[in-house]
Every structure is written in structure tokens, then in C-alpha cells.
């Protein structure tokens, strides 16, 4: 029988990428509102460009947030602290254009009439469909390509911030990983792309010589630290700063906007996406909270050994608490003779997907040990610090199918 063989690619970007700068500012503003008023309704969008930050959106809250202070703090933490970057924390302009949320929307989300079940009193913040996914390719039950891509730019940022080696690094960077699959299993890494912003070449060194130094450093100190040696071979291609010099970057090189890296934020294209971004949105927005809950469902199903892959879709109508639809697909990998219909029937009873139930389950209105800003770079999934990554429902799922 002939083997099935194909290639699959995912990308990521660093915290210094302009779109991620915007995401982190939006989520830092959200964090401050939530800290002051857990019932805050926030939709915060950020625009960053050369020397300028604009923060706008709709808010219903009792909290008061210093947008300028928060934006400058985030930009400092990322590392844009030098005037030569043309986007610098203390000198950039910061304009706040936040205003009140529509009362029409708020009325549908927070219903005050007497409803017996508390979880039925909070409707979805909007219509839409959200997806969750999990698979057995990595210990985190994430697709391997996106997990490697996230780790590459995270390690690159850690090296830059430590300041001991590769001191020429600047904040903006991108990564991309191409995997070769044989019979649906990861066989090897076919190509790795890393582009990183950097200082000008040192005096006495040519551009070509400096790029060779950067290439060697990234292969040895980043790629080989992240990707298992057994997946790299003599035919693996490394494309490091393939266009050469990359001095101009960040918001000076490209304008950044909140919500433009939704595939980087999720599964790297290995699973569907409903289209709604996450950052800057409070947990009443199901674009965010239901995507987290869907990942939680999918991950627990895979962790319980019910399937090797699982996609979960959930959809909502604005102002209505209960999902309009729930769909589970294990892509033909269900175990123990189970069907997708059987898995879905039990999952719907075990996982309450009403917005307030999701908020309570993960303490999304009072984060403990994490904050929304942390989600805004290096992925919302596959990181154990977040409560939707817990697999505490495994035992209950196994019991439901008499597998315990």
C-alpha cells in the first residue's frame, strides 16, 4: 500500500510584531478594566504606526483606566525603548478614543428579568461560530507546526531580553515551520523560516558577513533548541532573514492593528476559524470565551483517549445564552468503537457552553495566575498557564463511556 505524504506549514510572529503590539495593548487595557470591575464590557481596538498609538472602542464599566500609562508600559516591556526604532515607549503619541457601549447590545447581554437559572440570564455578546481543536501531535495536544513556530519566536524574544548573546536582536520577528507528514504522522521538518529585526552590522563587517552570523546564531541557539533533533535532517532547509537586512521593523516598518493574527493566535491553519479575533474583548464576547471553551472540550476529549484528533464548533445568537448548535468531529480517529454522535451527546452534558458558565469555569472575569495580556503573544492555546488548557474533565468523560 502506498504511503500518504504531504507538507503542512504554520507561522507565528513575536511580541514585537506590530499586530501583536496592538493585541497586547488592547488586552492590557482589558486587564485593567477587569481588575477594577469584573463585569466590565470591553471592546478595545489598537492601531500602532510610526510614533503613534490610537486606542479606541466601546466600554461599559465603573473602572477608570489610564490608557497612556498602560500603552507605554506594554511597549516598554516588549522592548521598543530606543529612539532609533522610530517607535519608542516614552516618546510615541498615545490617543484614547474609548467610549460607551451601545445600550441596545448591553440590554441583550445582561438581562435583568427574573430567570430561574442564573446561567440563562447572560446572553451571548454577539452571534457567530467558534472552533476548538486538539490532536496528539505534541504533549500540549496542539498541532506541531504552530507549536514549533510559537516556540521559535518565544525563544528568540527570551534571548533578546536576557541580553547575554545575540545582542543585535530587535523586537520584531516572524517564524514559519513546514512539516512533512507520512501516513498522517509528523515525519520530519522540511523547512524553517525565521526573520528577525536586528541592529546595523558592526563596523568592519559586511552585510553578507553579518547575515551569516545571524543565520548561524539562530540555527544553533533557537532552532536546534526548539525542534527535536530527530525531526531535522540534511535535507531540512533553513531560511534565515532570506531578504537580507532587516533593520526597519515593528510599527515603523508596518502599521499594526488588533485582531489581524487570528490564525497565529489559534491553530496555525490546522483547524477552522470562525473569524472573530480575541484580544481586547471581555469574556462576554463569545468570540473569545467560547473559543477557549471549545478548545477545552476538544483537549479533554483527546486527553481522555476518545480520539486522536477533535474539532469542536459552537455557535450563538446575540442575547441568547444557550448555543444555537454544537458540532464535534474526530476526523475518523474516534477510539473504543465510539461514534462522533456518541461523543457529542456525552460532551454536551459534561461541558456547559453558556457564556456565564464558561466565565465561571475559567474565572475569566477574575483571572488567577494569568492575565489577558499574556494570551496576546505566542498563542492562546497550548500553554499550561491558562485554565482552558486543563484536562480535569478526563475522568468524567471516561466514566461516561465506562472506560475508567
Swiss-Prot record:
Pathway info: Amino-acid biosynthesis; S-adenosyl-L-methionine biosynthesis; S-adenosyl-L-methionine from L-methionine: step 1/1
Required co-factors: Mg(2+); K(+)
Flexible loop: region residues: 101-111
Residues binding K(+): 45
Record flagged with keyword Endoplasmic reticulum: no
A Pfam family: S-AdoMet_synt_N
UniProt key word Ribonucleoprotein: no
Intracellular or extracellular location(s): Cytoplasm
Free-text comment on the cofactor: Binds 2 divalent ions per subunit.
Top enzyme class: transferase
Binding site for Mg(2+): 19
GO cellular component: cytoplasm
One Gene Ontology MF term: methionine adenosyltransferase activity
Binding site for ATP: 17, 172-174, 245-246, 254, 260-261, 277, 281
E.C. code: 2.5.1.6
Binding site for L-methionine: 58, 101, 254, 285
Catalytic activity as recorded in UniProt: L-methionine + ATP + H2O = S-adenosyl-L-methionine + phosphate + diphosphate
Gene3D superfamilies: 3.30.300.10
Keyword list, A-Z: ATP-binding, Cytoplasm, Magnesium, Metal-binding, Nucleotide-binding, One-carbon metabolism, Potassium, Transferase
Subunit structure: Homotetramer; dimer of dimers.
Family: Belongs to the AdoMet synthase family.
Role description: Catalyzes the formation of S-adenosylmethionine (AdoMet) from methionine and ATP. The overall synthetic reaction is composed of two sequential steps, AdoMet formation and the subsequent tripolyphosphate hydrolysis which occurs prior to release of AdoMet from the enzyme.
Protein name, entry field: S-adenosylmethionine synthase
Organism: Chlorobium luteolum (strain DSM 273 / BCRC 81028 / 2530) (Pelodictyon luteolum)
Gene of this entry: metK
Amino acid at each position: 500500500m502506498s504511503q500518504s505524504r504531504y507538507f503542512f506549514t504554520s507561522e507565528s510572529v513575536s511580541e514585537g510584531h506590530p499586530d501583536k503590539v496592538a493585541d497586547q495593548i488592547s488586552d492590557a487595557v482589558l486587564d485593567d478594566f477587569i481588575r477594577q470591575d469584573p463585569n466590565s464590557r470591553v471592546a478595545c481596538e489598537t492601531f500602532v504606526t510610526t510614533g503613534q498609538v490610537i486606542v479606541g472602542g466601546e466600554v461599559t464599566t465603573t473602572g477608570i483606566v489610564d490608557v497612556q500609562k498602560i500603552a507605554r508600559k506594554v511597549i516598554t516591556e516588549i522592548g521598543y525603548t530606543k529612539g532609533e526604532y522610530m517607535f519608542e515607549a516614552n516618546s510615541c503619541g498615545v490617543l484614547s478614543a474609548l467610549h460607551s457601549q451601545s445600550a441596545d447590545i448591553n440590554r441583550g447581554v445582561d438581562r435583568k428579568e427574573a430567570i430561574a437559572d442564573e446561567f440563562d440570564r447572560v446572553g451571548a455578546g454577539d452571534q457567530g461560530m467558534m472552533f476548538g481543536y486538539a490532536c496528539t501531535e505534541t504533549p500540549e495536544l496542539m498541532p506541531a507546526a504552530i507549536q514549533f513556530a510559537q516556540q521559535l519566536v518565544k525563544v528568540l524574544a527570551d534571548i533578546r531580553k536576557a541580553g547575554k548573546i545575540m545582542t543585535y536582536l530587535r523586537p520584531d520577528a516572524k517564524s514559519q515551520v513546514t512539516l512533512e507528514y507520512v501516513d498522517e504522522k509528523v515525519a520530519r521538518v522540511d523547512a524553517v523560516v525565521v526573520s528577525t529585526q536586528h541592529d546595523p552590522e558592526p563596523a568592519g563587517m559586511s552585510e553578507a558577513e553579518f547575515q551569516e552570523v545571524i543565520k548561524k546564531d539562530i540555527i544553533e541557539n533557537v532552532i536546534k533548541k526548539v525542534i527535536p533533533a530527530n525531526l531535522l535532517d540534511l535535507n531540512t532547509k533553513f531560511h534565515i532573514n532570506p531578504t537580507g537586512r532587516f533593520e526597519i521593523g515593528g510599527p515603523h516598518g508596518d502599521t499594526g492593528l488588533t485582531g489581524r493574527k487570528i490564525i497565529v493566535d489559534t491553530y496555525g491553519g490546522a483547524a477552522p476559524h470562525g473569524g472573530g479575533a480575541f484580544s481586547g474583548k471581555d469574556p462576554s464576547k463569545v468570540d473569545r470565551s467560547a473559543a477557549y471553551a471549545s478548545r477545552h472540550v476538544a483537549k479533554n476529549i483527546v486527553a481522555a483517549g476518545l480520539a486522536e484528533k477533535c474539532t469542536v464548533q459552537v455557535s450563538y445568537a446575540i442575547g441568547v445564552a444557550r448555543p444555537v448548535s454544537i458540532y464535534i468531529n474526530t476526523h475518523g480517529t474516534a477510539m473504543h468503537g465510539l461514534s462522533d454522535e456518541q461523543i457529542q451527546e456525552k460532551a454536551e452534558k459534561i461541558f456547559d457552553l453558556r457564556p456565564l458558565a464558561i466565565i465561571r469555569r475559567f474565572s475569566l472575569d477574575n483571572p488567577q495566575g494569568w492575565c489577558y495580556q499574556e494570551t496576546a503573544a505566542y498563542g492562546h492555546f497550548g500553554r499550561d498557564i491558562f485554565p482552558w488548557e486543563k484536562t480535569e474533565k478526563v475522568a468524567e468523560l471516561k466514566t461516561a463511556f465506562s472506560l475508567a
